[in-house]
Design a protein with these regions (language model features):
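Conserved Radical SAM active-site core
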Residues: 92-214
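Flexible, acidic/Gly-rich N-terminal and inter-domain linker regions that tether
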Residues: 1-105
Length: 215
């Protein structure tokens, strides 16, 4: 599956605000798009009932809402853990895992297809590095499970960047994804709900600790 359309989850609120100005739309339309994506969890342009029909058509024409294709699902014996294998738009494979623990619903998400770190104990490390995921591809992993949980009356409570790849080796996209998921007017997951796992890239760790992020 390939498409020239940008993945809508790659865009931040400021980009939507600029786009609405270019399209001659009032600025609040950007807020409605943002709310639709991250609060309502809508997965197609047609679902954006707060937008006029013409604007929904523009969104559908200009953006892709699907960057992940489900390839395989695996479940633990108790059904509390679900692993999903996805194919990206260029057919690279990644994994995302949902873990249900008591009141928590934790997602383990992927930041790279493959990994360049080469850890001998890690299956992903033995694959070699394929490519970085975009911020939108990281975000979409969360939104897909958020929609599934919402249908069960539940929400994502925690996100761990502990899937395939080294998050700090894909720093910009990983941080952009966290900022998008933590945005107060968007998905609004607090910073303490995120965990970033790293093999220990010291310059990136220093950068991460020096940056001010929402608590």
């Amino acid at each position: 599956m390939t498409t020239d359309k940008p993945l809508i989850y790659d865009w931040d609120l400021a980009q939507f605000q600029a786009l609405m100005a270019d399209w001659g739309q009032p600025s609040y339309r950007a807020d409605q798009i943002w709310d639709g994506l991250y609060q309502q969890l809508w997965a197609s342009a047609e679902e954006f009932s707060t937008l006029p029909k013409g604007l929904r058509a523009h969104l559908d024409e200009h953006f892709s809402f699907v960057g992940l294709r489900l390839s395989k699902q695996l479940y633990s014996s108790d059904g509390q853990t679900e692993k999903r294998l996805y194919l990206l738009r260029d057919d690279q494979a990644i994994e995302t895992v949902l873990m249900r623990y008591d009141e928590r619903r934790t997602l383990c998400i992927t930041t790279q297809a493959g990994c360049a770190m080469g850890c001998t104990f890690c299956a992903t490390g033995q694959m070699g590095f394929r490519r970085n995921l975009s911020s939108g591809e990281i975000v979409e992993q969360v939104l897909v499970f958020a929609r599934l949980l919402a249908a069960e009356g539940e929400t994502v409570t925690n996100v761990v960047l502990m899937g395939m790849g080294e998050p700090f080796h894909n720093y910009e996209a990983s941080m952009a994804a966290l900022d998008r998921l933590g945005h107060a007017e968007g998905f609004n997951l607090g910073a303490r709900r995120f965990t970033v796992s790293t093999v220990g890239l010291i310059p990136a760790i220093q950068r991460f600790t020096s940056e001010q992020r929402k608590e």
